[in-house]
Amino acid sequence: MNHLEIEFKTMLTKEEHDRLLQLFADISPISQTNYYIESDQQSIRHAHMAFRVRTFKHHEAELTLKIPQEVGALELNQNLTPEETENILQNNEFPTGEILETLLQKEIPIQDLKILGSLETIRYEKEDKIGLFALDESHYLGKKDFELEVEVEDFEKGKENFLDFLKQHKIDYKPGKSKIARFSENL
């Protein structure tokens, strides 16, 4: 499944996270783990992409390659079987499909790719008139952080609505890097 991801995010304090959590009181959290994939030469980063395996409870997993666009990022997603997931995580063996083809087209040395580490997130998701909200608490490399993301259809309208939402909830906008960037900075 491929889609154009247009999202806005802000970093949160623990207090802001806990305050917003009240808006998600009727939502059960999703536990997910991102395993970030890169080469020693940082070929994925140099190609301005992000590459990960995301696992969920109940042995569900997906492989994702994010490719920046003029607005947002093209997200290529491929569902994984438990065997494919294990082959990636244990043996750095990637399944055939559009993601592998794209990496090869971009001359990424597949044989050099490996798992850098993982980031665990407790996520609350809720659809709203603005878009799909995700309230996250992430743990990685001995660190913990909090963020609010909203995925929208329209960049300009989405940005305006997101900033209005933050103002309404008395939260200062604090730009945040992507999870993979925050993870990588702490390696």
What is the meaning of each model-derived region?
Residues 1-187:
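Phosphate-end processing signature that detects enzymes handling 5′-triphosphorylated RNA
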